[in-house]
Amino acid sequence: LGRGRFVFTDDYSVFDWGKMPDEIPGKGASLCAMGAYNFERFEDAGIPTHYAGVVDSNGDVVPLEDTDVPPEEMAIELATVPDLPHDGRDYDYDAYYAAARDNVLVPLEIVFRNSVPVGSSLRGRATPAECCLDYDDWPDEPVSLPEPVVEFSTKLEEGDRYLDREEAARIAGPAALDDLESVALRVNELVTDRAAEGGLTHQDGKIECILADGEVTVADVAGTFDENRFEYDGQQVSKEVVRQYYKKTQPDWVDAVADAKTRAKAEDVADWKSLCEREPNPLPDSVVRATSDLYRAGANTYTGIEFFDAPSLAEAVDAVRDL
């Protein structure tokens, strides 16, 4: 299929909304740098990826360490993503794979969790005992897991939903679920170890995969502040900062999103946003600036490369604590 490029923008999304009404400067380049750094580490560890390099100021595809500017484009090996036919919320995965070519996106997100914060959706799907924890009930505090938990959710449906292993295996098609889980656990280990080197705690994240010539290959982007949740000195260093800010300052919109998703499921409507009665408002400039500094300082710390003129991560974290 050849090569393509990911262009990383400063747009962001929370609560599955899609493009929000403003941008976070430097976010795109921060995520591109982190994603490239991780892909190169994965390749060094023997994990296949679709990564081919970043694009420098001359338009050349180079390794991350050879770029002369914070990268905003990543070269990748292309994969097939067929249309997923559906009737309401009934999706035809057999037709999806029938239309696929050799390199096909596995239409799952493989989620890994190292800890379970208060409010995590996992608490509603599993008991502490099922997560190898010695509690009768979930405590009212974050919990570190003795071993990572892997879950599977849909990727291409209008609304994400978590799956049991039987349904996940069906949706995975020709990709073996055990292989997807094994790759996810190895990715989690590498990201967790690198985060710890920079003083960050890696809480959870996800990967997406393609099946390339019969081999599970990591695709999309992995180990960034949008795909994963990290903590530094007790403070979130991820898109979670913005998500929580919207919960605190625009609860009516957050509730409207949840209501629309519930109604869409009950009415068998695929496009839940068409049922949402509110729109999000832009962030204040001060929140945009603080979040921008957090992304850029975090990328500098995680990669060990001073790509961005940003405060230290400790300073950036202090600035977002009270948002």
Provide a role label for each language-model segment.
Residues 3, 105, 199-202, 213-216:
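Coil-to-beta-strand transition motifs
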Residues 172-203:
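A long amphipathic alpha-helix within ATP-dependent nucleotide-binding catalytic cores
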Residues 203, 207-250:
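Catalytic activation segment of kinase domains across protein kinase-like and atypical kinase folds
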Residues 1-149, 272-323:
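Active-site loop/lid in soluble adenylation, ligation, and acyl-transfer enzymes
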Residues 52-56, 195-212:
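A short glycine-rich, hydrophobically flanked beta-strand micro-motif that places a catalytic Asp/Glu
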Residues 149, 153-159, 189-199, 224-226:
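Phosphate-binding core of ATP-grasp and ATP-grasp-like enzymes
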Residues 233-305:
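C-lobe/activation-segment region of protein kinase-like
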Residues 141-177:
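A short mid-domain helix/strand-loop element embedded in enzyme catalytic domains
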